[in-house]
Amino acid sequence: MKKILSLLVLMAVFTSCEEDVKFNTPAVQGFKNNELWKADAFTATLTVDGSLVIQATSGLETVVLKTSGYTPATYTLAVNDRNKASYSTIDDSGAASDYQTIAPDGTGQIIISGDPRETDLAKGYISGSFHFNAVNDEGLIVYFADGVFYKVPITGVQ
């Protein structure tokens, strides 16, 4: 009887241990004003002038990250127009709100990963991290922290 009971306990333990881990590859996400923001769709584009543009959308919200290059490096935002981030949204009434890092009080960084397991232009994907404060015309600030873009597919050159 003890053996049967032990066997039943072991069976219950092993059948209840199910791993429900979902991998988010590729992905663009971060914390917008302390709440998790995850993109539904995203693309990375290399431009003819050598810059990188990553566009990520979630419903009626869009984040655009632009760097002056696509080589692994840290790109400081708000210094010039070539390195910038923007966030835009459309509310229920159809009014658009646009936030930019090139406005006063806009700051941040985009870091392109140099790890060949994460960024491989020949295979067509790029990874890195970002954080930024962006300001709209009324002076309101939206901030993104702990942002990550991981193995975002490069869709082409424009």
Whereabouts are the PLM-identified features?
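Sec-dependent signal peptide recognition
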Residues: K2-L7
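C-terminal motif of bacterial Sec signal peptides marking the signal peptidase cleavage site
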Residues: V13-S16
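Bacterial signal peptide processing site
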Residues: E18-V21
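C-terminal or internal capping secondary-structure element at the end of a domain, subdomain, or sheet
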Residues: D115-Q158
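Acidic, metal-coordinating catalytic segment for phosphate/diphosphate chemistry
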Residues: T25
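Well-ordered beta-strand positions in beta-sheet-rich domains
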Residues: L36, V64, Q109, I141-F149
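Surface-exposed helix/loop patches within compact recognition domains
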Residues: V28, K38-K123
